[in-house]
Amino acid sequence: MPFSASAQTTESANQEKVQDSPKPVDRKTAEEIITTANDIVVVGTRASLQSATTRKREANTIVDSIVADDIASFPDKNIGDSLARITGVQLSRDFGEGTAVSIRGVEPDLNRVEINGVSQVSATGGRAGDFRELATELVKSIDVYKGYAVDLTEGGIGGTVRVETRKPLDLKDPLLTGVVSYQNLDTAETWKPRVTFVAGTPKFLIDGLGVLVNVTYSDVDTRQDYISNTNWSRLADFDHSTEKTVANPLYANYNTYESCAGVGGATTATATANRLACETQFFDWAPTVPRYRSWVRNDKRLSADLALQYQVAPNFRAYGQVQINKRNQNLQDTNYSIDLTRIERFNLDPALAAGANGGTSRPQVQLGTSTVNENHVVTSLQTALNAVNIGSVAVPNWNGAANIVGVQRRDFSYDQDSKYFTGGFRWDLDRLHIDFMGSHAKATTVSESNLISIGTSVSGITIDRDNAQGIPVFSFPSEFDPADPAVYSDFTRTGANGQVLPVYGPALQYRPSQASNTEDQLKFDADWEIDHPIVSKIEFGAQARRQNYVSYNGGGTRLLDPATLTYQQSANVSFTSQIQNNPAQVRDGNTWYITPTQYQALISSIGGTLGGAPLFTGLKNAPAGIPSNIAFPNFDADVLSQIYDLSGFDQDLVLQADGQPQIPAYLIKEKVYAGYIMADIDTEVLGMRLTGNAGLRWTQTKDEGVGTNISRVTRTTATGGTETVVLAAQEARISNTYTDFLPAFNANLAITPELSLRANYAKNLARPRPTDLVPNINCLDDQTLTGSEDVCTAGNPDLKPYRADQWEVNLAWYPNADTTISLGYYKKYEASFVIPNVTRSGVDLFHDGITYTVRQSVNGYGALLDGIEASGQTVFTFLPQPFDGFGVTGNITYARAIRTNLTNSATGGELKEYPGLSKFTYNASVFYDKGFLNARLSYNYRSKWLSTVLDAANGNNPLYRKAEGYLDGKITLRFPKYHFNVFVEMQNINREYSKVYINKDMPVDLYYPGRRMFIGLQAKL
């Protein structure tokens, strides 16, 4: 049973009840009650639950629903948080807020979300939108279609989410209401406003013309503090064990590190490479970039909805609607890390003697400077004591203790807008009913990403992960304070050998981007009622959609002159700095020269520390010794421009440069045509009413992609060396077309008036992510090797869509108007799906007969998922007053991946988990709704799940998220005589946190999104 006003659809609402059964509130009556009250909080939760139940019983396939009254009584501020209450829905959260949902284990990109019949558009490269853009105050109802009927737009393999906002002719009387609240986040220690205004009337100027305006403004502060072990890899042998960490069958007979000296090879270089491959078997796992991060977001959100409806005639109603959502965000990211990406960062033994054919060895880490557990995972270590020159005497390149500590700071705007324009009509012609809609939707994202990075040299840092959470605790020498900005400009710090450690100047970056997603749609639906003992209605319709995805990420990829390798200017800017006592010049290209005095003054001016609550406030089981604050350089343009030329830190070159348009990072033009016909069934079988439908949907998809085609060659030079040069860089265009026929069958058997059995079978599809379709191609022709194919990375416009067959049965019992008990089983067979980052040989990339070795997304086949869902709700009306106001709702879902056909790229073994699928999900809620008091306490839980199939930054391992459970609550005191309510609500009462990990020994990220409180007042006239 969904956590909110939701119950599994099992029976038609017009089913006749037995004489002594309480009569439920039908959908129309319940929604009239809600509308008459003109206040989504004042209306009782009980009536809303009854309305939601009836709404689902009337649906033509298996549906869960939430109505607006019930949403408003939840502690939810966006659609995603409300959807988490639905059976089988698993919510993805970012900064504590719901962003997207998996439905029955199917990832967000494969679920369709509609707002008033229009696709929710996203400008972030995927098909899943961000639920944070739409406030729940705008919403009238949400329907989650888990089954499929052919009158639904295809695209939701997991399910289809239909969001409907309020319409003016739904009102019976004029409406004017406002809500003012303040919200607090415990980690940010700020109070920010949230304001809602709603006004509408069913009669505006003339009879039949209705207007409704709904506006919500919210100023949201969010913050997440991360403790991270990132970039897990095997760089060196820390424990000197003879047990292999990962065995290589090519070197099965070499059972010690020292024995690898005998591997040999045809040349010294080959022998060294072979010896390293042998020694790698003994390398231990260690995080090479342990770090602390604090990410702060200030997000000013505006959601506005204007709806007009006009009753032209008793049988003809037209409408027009505009919805605008704006998010103006300021992102402040502080990343504090220790660089362990080279073996010189550790304290090393002398290298072993050269082996067969001169093959050299990689030095082992000194015993006593680290600890390693039984699974060959490093749990603590000490970094290098001195700077190590890995360059030459003439051109030194310092490593070891040099520049080992770094801090990066971003402080930039990130704005997202979406706009939806819809218009249409409903025309009733006796037995023929026609619906027509036209729409235009557009989403844009503009990013002004910048960065300042500084580093410094520190000797002998201890990193200890031997704690319950496995997270790094940094211990620095006594003279180094990570919360003091001045440590970055200290020119006197020395290593253990007494030599002064080098100091490095700052690096600056600017990475602008613009992206948009536009959809135009025409949609026609018709119902024709007929007299027939079995078929009650024929439904048919057609749809045409045109969608354009485009993104620009700085550009500069067009090769203007191959002879001189002159490229188009890029909007990206990268500056480095050199500190010299007496620099001969201020600037050489993108390198700037500053004096030690200038650098110290700069750090003094831009140095700062984190605000708000102490670092890692609220994080459960955090070990002692982690810092409460860290120092960082502010990206202060006024100060930085006194040294650096920041005139290019703008959007001027993002779209065009050198008189030519930039090649987009991706451009996908997609056209979709669809049509359907469906017969509605209404008959009797053995005295039991049988309703349902059977239909067929035809759809055709045409994709055209534009990206970048870069051709490079590695060749032998005249002096016998090798060089890699770019031969060409140009636009690449590839297209693809595919057609599908999607049958669907739904049946609903009323065994008794209170007991119904539903069944569903359907085929459905979901289209690949636009970024997977982009023909971005980067090929290398290595002419120094004979008999080998060119190697390319590329998008894959030839990707087949996700195609699935689904089955479901559901049994539901409605003993009275307030009670529902439901049990269902479902199965999904994904005939084709998409696997990212697969390397294949023999690929005819350009369809010209020439084959390449290509790393790209490819299709996988044959995944099989199933699950069991159970839900229930009731109101304790049988209890004596005042306890008759109590009620409960709850649901539980068990889901499994029977077969995934996925591979763990790190081990080569089978990957049994399916992305986004939690084995268990459950919701529980208790509410009280009577008189002046409305209160609810809600808990949402999901067990651990696979979040990433392959993470290249962490040894190609899959990444998992730990189980999470969130407790939310709200109390409303109602004073209808005075037309106002007051409320207090809290999210994440239990201070839940998130953890990303590879396995129990190898955590990646641990972070806490904070606990949020709202205090507010609602008034109604």
Predicted regions span which residues?
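N-terminal periplasmic "start-of-domain" segments of outer-membrane beta-barrel proteins
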Residues: 13, 27, 38-74, 108-111, ...
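Short loop/turn motifs that connect adjacent beta-strands in outer-membrane beta-barrel proteins
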Residues: 34, 168-175, 204-209, 315, ...
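N-terminal periplasmic accessory domains that precede
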Residues: 79-82, 99-102, 114, 130-132, ...
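Extracytoplasmic beta-strand/coil segments of soluble accessory domains associated
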Residues: 80-119, 146
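Short acidic/polar hinge/loop motifs at secondary-structure boundaries
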Residues: 118-147
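Outer-membrane beta-barrel signature, preferentially recognizing the C-terminal barrel domain
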Residues: 416-418, 670, 736, 765-824, ...
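Gram-negative outer-membrane beta-barrel transporters
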Residues: 825-830, 834-841, 845-949, 990
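C-terminal beta-signal and adjacent terminal beta-strands/loops
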Residues: 940-950, 972-1021
